[in-house]
């Protein structure tokens, strides 16, 4: 694809809601499956930093789903430009792009709307369809719809789908809702208890954990064909203005190549697809392995341990002693390594579970990790490096996010995290010239030079040099 695309048609819709828990993911997956069953190609996207919803999109489409995060991409205009480029890059070849919002439509950083689904719609000029929970409500839903559409002059809201409502109730109130709100009624979705997705502390359970997910998706799609106005949704999507882009930022990767081992299994599954692609562009050849099921780290020049749910597999991870020993040897030998959140947890000496049992883990970093009863250091942050390290020089900054119920007896102190929309700050991350590990997650579309520097370190190791 050319580095600059001007006026490219990308039919698209963003499905948003007044609040979390409105059933957006269910409706989005139903729509994606229905479009697939019609023989149409869809590109799926998720507003914000969430890892789990894109896994559901991917299971439906058999192709990756991509995050569009205005904060992680660099905030303000750089973030908006990166979102447009990402939407163009992955959406231009599809029949339609479906974007799923996060939280409430206007909910952003602090008490404002920065990095919200609303700001994403504004940045990408995308029509918005509200998914509203209709349980126990009648005409009052018109006030919700009208308020959501009128809260900002440029709300981009064009229509609505009422979720968890009987079709006959929807038909009874449909005209009144349209008249009062000025929005187009685009269908409804009844409550389907047999097709719900369970939740846990970090959100929905992952797609791979759901029994008969394919059957549930088929049932959801069949229902969508009955009660959602799919043809009208497609017509709304085609009315979206062409997208223009200014091209991706200059990127000068190392000319060599290196093998980057990436942990990916039930315990470690939180990765941004675009981050992996940036690493490939920087010179990394990706190989995937399982800390749960494999006996040792595969031959590699670098290591990336992402987040996930290692706490759910504490015993199995502990009992895989050969993998733990293999990782410990590699890290003791200064293998370049990124460890985010769950990956950082796994490298500790041990994990203490909710029953106060202590499970030995890799032991490459000091201290132990443990679960708590509440979210720790939740939300967007800006990280500032306090020393030169594998990624950057002292004083450099990057946008990031944290979302975890676990904690550590030693979170590191080589970066400082500044909470967005707040005066709070705290030390975090262990970093040196070959290792960076901590709870924050970053997106390499927001910091391509960090990806290039990491891969360069892997290449230098392969070539027998020790430069960054």
Language model regions located:
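Cysteine-nucleophile active-site neighborhood
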Residues: 286, 310-389
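A short helix->loop->beta-strand "cap" motif at the edges of active sites that frequently abuts
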Residues: 126, 183, 332-336
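Internal gly/pro-rich beta-alpha loop/helix module
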Residues: 138-252
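Structural motif
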Residues: 14, 98-100, 129-131, 161, ...
């Amino acid at each position: 694809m050319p580095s600059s695309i001007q006026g490219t048609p990308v039919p698209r819709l963003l499905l948003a809601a007044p609040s979390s828990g409105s059933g957006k993911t269910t409706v989005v997956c139903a729509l994606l499956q229905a479009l697939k069953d019609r023989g149409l190609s869809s590109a799926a996207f998720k507003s914000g930093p969430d890892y789990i919803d894109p896994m559901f999109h991917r299971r439906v489409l058999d192709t990756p789903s991509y995050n569009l995060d205005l904060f992680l991409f660099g905030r303000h205009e750089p973030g908006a430009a990166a979102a447009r480029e990402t939407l163009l890059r992955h959406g231009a070849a599809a029949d339609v792009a479906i974007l799923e919002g996060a939280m409430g439509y206007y909910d952003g950083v602090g008490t404002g709307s920065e990095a919200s689904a609303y700001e994403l719609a504004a940045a990408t000029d995308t029509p918005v369809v509200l998914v509203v929970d209709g349980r126990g409500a009648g005409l009052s839903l018109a006030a919700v719809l009208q308020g959501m559409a009128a809260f900002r002059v440029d709300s981009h809201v064009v229509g609505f789908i009422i979720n968890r409502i009987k079709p006959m109730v929807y038909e009874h109130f449909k005209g009144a809702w349209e008249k009062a709100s000025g929005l187009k009624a685009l269908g409804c979705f009844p409550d389907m208890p047999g097709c719900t997705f369970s939740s846990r502390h970090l959100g929905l359970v992952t797609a791979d954990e759901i029994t008969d997910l394919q059957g549930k998706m088929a049932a959801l799609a069949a229902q969508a064909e009955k009660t959602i106005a799919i043809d009208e949704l497609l017509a709304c999507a085609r009315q979206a203005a062409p997208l223009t882009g200014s091209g991706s930022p200059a990127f000068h990767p190392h000319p060599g190549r290196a093998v980057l081992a990436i942990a990916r299994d039930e315990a470690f599954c939180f990765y941004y697809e675009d981050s992996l692609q940036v690493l490939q562009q920087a010179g990394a050849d990706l190989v995937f392995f399982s800390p749960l099921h494999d006996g040792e780290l595969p031959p590699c020049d670098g290591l990336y341990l992402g987040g996930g749910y290692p706490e759910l597999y504490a015993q199995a991870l502990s009992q895989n002693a050969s993998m733990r020993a293999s990782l410990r040897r590699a890290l003791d030998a200064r293998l370049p390594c990124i460890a985010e959140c769950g990956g950082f947890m796994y490298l500790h000496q041990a994990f203490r579970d909710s029953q106060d049992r202590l499970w030995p883990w890799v032991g490459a970093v000091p201290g132990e990790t443990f679960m708590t009863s509440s979210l720790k250091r939740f939300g967007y942050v800006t990280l500032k490096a306090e020393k030169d390290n594998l990624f950057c020089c002292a004083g450099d900054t990057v946008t990031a996010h944290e979302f975890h119920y676990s904690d550590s007896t030693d979170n590191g102190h080589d970066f400082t995290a500044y909470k967005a929309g707040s005066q709070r700050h705290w030390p975090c991350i262990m970093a040196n010239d070959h290792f960076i590990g901590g709870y924050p997650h970053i997106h390499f579309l927001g910091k391509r030079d960090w990806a290039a520097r990491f891969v360069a370190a892997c290449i230098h190791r392969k070539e027998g040099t020790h430069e960054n």
